[in-house]
Curated annotation (Swiss-Prot):
Superkingdom as given in the UniProt entry: Bacteria
Cytoplasm listed as a keyword: yes
Functional summary from the UniProt entry: Functions in the N-end rule pathway of protein degradation where it conjugates Leu, Phe and, less efficiently, Met from aminoacyl-tRNAs to the N-termini of proteins containing an N-terminal arginine or lysine.
Catalytic activity annotation: N-terminal L-lysyl-[protein] + L-leucyl-tRNA(Leu) = N-terminal L-leucyl-L-lysyl-[protein] + tRNA(Leu) + H(+); N-terminal L-arginyl-[protein] + L-leucyl-tRNA(Leu) = N-terminal L-leucyl-L-arginyl-[protein] + tRNA(Leu) + H(+); L-phenylalanyl-tRNA(Phe) + an N-terminal L-alpha-aminoacyl-[protein] = an N-terminal L-phenylalanyl-L-alpha-aminoacyl-[protein] + tRNA(Phe)
Naturally occurring in which organism (per UniProt): Campylobacter jejuni subsp. jejuni serotype O:23/36 (strain 81-176)
GO biological process: protein catabolic process
Protein name per its UniProtKB record: Leucyl/phenylalanyl-tRNA--protein transferase
Lineage, uppermost ranks: Bacteria, Pseudomonadati, Campylobacterota, Epsilonproteobacteria, Campylobacterales
Amino acid sequence: MESSNLYSKLLNAPKNAPVFLSQNLEADFIVKAYTFGLFPWTSKPVTWWCPDPRCILIPNQIHIQKNMKKFINLYQIKLDYDFLKLITLCRDTRSQSWIDDEFITTYYKLFTQGYAHSLELYENNELIGGIYGLILGKVFFGESMVSIKKNASKVAMIKLCDLLKPYDFIIDCQVYNQHLEFMGAHNISRKEFLNILKEKCNQESGFKNFKDLIT
């Protein structure tokens, strides 16, 4: 299907339901799908979503609450250090998770290809939280966060915003929740989001390697 036809179909797709289903997750398809605002949410079958409205966060609009300041420098930050361990932790800390073995294998492949990235938090060399997602152009497509210690996922988001501020990124948060709103995220229309992707996904990120943003 041509890009223009897919764009038109997505504008008229269900607002709060899967756009389509697929039997498997394929790395190449995921990259293409993300550029059209699609993301997988469940498996067997894989459900693909493009919700309207869409929740995003602009890094320089991050809200840091007063009670968070004591946590910001409490943990060690590592980038792309142990992606596989982080995504597995995201699965294992949830009683019900769409992150199955196929999902982990596919996203780890995207990591080895340079698309998927992780920001990890450590305390005494123990992984205690973080966030992972895909970087395409100047968009960080957030997939999942995890927090073993208090406020670790919030610290991860704050640190991610700090790193991406100089590069004019947006962060795709997918679906609104109050936790994200407290941090400065907000909803925009699907049409506006897709138009942003047209521009941002075709730009250079501004850095060579994500892991080198922390020296």
